[in-house]
């Protein structure tokens, strides 16, 4: 079935949020899988790195001691600015480096239009 119908969008933050919420619900314990533990689960032993925009509205409120960044990121998502995988820059300053996003979206629109022309 896959990502096209599961709704996860291949976003690791969405998956992390779902993991925490499912455990909390399943065990009726809102203290299970705090954001710090969830973040460690998705980054443990990783040699890749990502930088998020801490000024993104989803990163607020920051809390009295400015300590809510991980909780905001895990439970609200965030705007990915930079991403490096195996030493290669995938995103820099919020711009994908490995593909032309506009062209990819245009190709997707054209493929969907072509598909529906054949069945409508």
Label for each model-derived stretch:
Residues 1-2, 54:
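Fold-independent oxyanion-binding glycine-rich loops
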